[in-house]
Amino acid sequence: MLMYRRDFLKSVTAAWVAFGLPNPLGGAFATNRVIPLRRLGQSQRFDYEWLKERARALAATPYHSRKRVLPTPLERLSWDQYQSIRYRQDHALWADSDAHFQVKFFHLGLYFHSPVRMYEVVDGMAQELAYDPAAFDYGSSGLNGKGLPKDLGFAGFRLNTRKDIDRDFAAFLGASYFRAVGQEGQYGQSARGLAVNTGSSGPEEFPDFIAYYLEQPTADADTVVMYGLLDSPSIAGAYRFSITHADVLRMDIDSALYPRETIERLGIAPCTSMYQVGENDRRMGWDWRPEIHDTDGLFLWTGNGEWIWRPLCNPLHLRFNMFLDNNPRGFGLLQRDRDFDHYQDDGVFYEKRPCLWVEPKHGWGEGSVQLVEIPTFDETFDNIVAFWNPRNKPHPGQELLFGYRLYWGAFPPVSSSLAYCVATRTGLGGVVGQKRKYFSWRFAVDFVGGKLAALARVHDVSVEPVLHMTRGRPEIVSARPLHEIRGYRVMFDVVPLEDSAQQIDIRLYLRDTNGEPLTETWLYQWVPPILEERKY
């Protein structure tokens, strides 16, 4: 599907808003009676190799869209009406087994016009699951299901456990989007199967998962295995997911990609998030809540072992960054700020939003982690994307194999022995009480962990900030213990060039007297105001 990102995400982001909350109708559907889903056609042999061949064959044929014209009542549903349509517990897949997991399906309608074929895999045999209007409770939608086509199909699905039938822990809905939660039980950012031409000059392509194959788990399995067939105008692909439900939910993913066309910018393991306003960027801070974001930074563990933290921003114009690397060890969008007082939102609980960490399972070679930041006026628009972009552009006839793990939870599964950044604050520079003679911008960066807690208690110790910037000049640079956080605060002003409003790239870390780093590397991009708007 080809379209402009903002138009597409107006629909998909809004549709994700309430997912992950307890199903208010779930208890009404919880009965001892289970109604098995109807199957279509004959079962057929299935494994991942078969699916890869299916994707390869798709890529060798012209693409055709699977979007369908829905009945008018489904097209005209409001969000509240659509959200009231719930899958009945007595129709849940595997509800009639001893499996730890169950599957419930999403209805087509509102923004979701592309039916996704669903298959169950049992003992290496796959059989398609039939859509049944009777499997849904239509709530306050105004629909009763009787007038809907019998072959309408499904929009997606969600996973829950037998012990908690009202709350799902993972959901796949819309294009190749999916989400999961950790111990906090709160949805936040999304992942995608693939990103195509994100942040490029033309329209972005949103590949679709056109079929899912759900493997029936055994009674004692703590992992559910599923497969996805992906298709788009420029590429097809086969995916294998192994999802382990735990406090930090883990997805082991293998993907095989088959380009139809040469692709300008291919995004592997894309993470999609939202950042409107935070401690470091209050440009869109007209809301009564102090901070509004799903995540507050991009975290990188590079192939050469460097740990990098890049705070997110809500820029005035689209901003695109490349972090060149060779065989990256991991990257992800994190929500480090876990303090409710910093958000004050008791409805969506931003402090509980999960981090998403990407861990390659084998060497990915040369390429870059790419970060796209898009201006947004409100929290309903996902404006942050991060993904891996291979150095070589994919071409038709290739098979591209990528294996990786996704971790969803309050913290990533890896950490360094170095101190890490917990806050970045910005504001007008200069010395309080003294007249300012020129414009400057203040940065206050807080680090905790590592050796800093011990060093903060010692008076005769030298901790040196190492600061670099691409233009302008730094002044009033300091690094001092901050006992309230058992760490250090680095403060400095940036004085931009008088005749330039060009972006300034800033790089900072702390080191000891032996020149050894004490902290991860902090990166930032700041665009000074034009000369006429520099108020001091």
Curated annotation (Swiss-Prot):
GO terms for cellular component: outer membrane-bounded periplasmic space. Gene3D superfamilies: 2.70.98.10, Immunoglobulins. GO terms for biological process: beta-glucan biosynthetic process. It is found in: Periplasm. Residues 1-30 form the signal peptide. Keywords: Periplasm, Signal. GO terms for molecular function: carbohydrate binding; catalytic activity. Pfam families: MdoG (PF04349). Predicted to be exported by the Tat system. The position of the signal peptide cleavage has not been experimentally proven. Pathway: Glycan metabolism; osmoregulated periplasmic glucan (OPG) biosynthesis. Belongs to the OpgD/OpgG family. HAMAP family: MdoD_OpgD. Probably involved in the control of the structural glucose backbone of osmoregulated periplasmic glucans (OPGs). PANTHER family: GLUCANS BIOSYNTHESIS PROTEIN, GLUCANS BIOSYNTHESIS PROTEIN D. This is Glucans biosynthesis protein D. The gene is opgD.
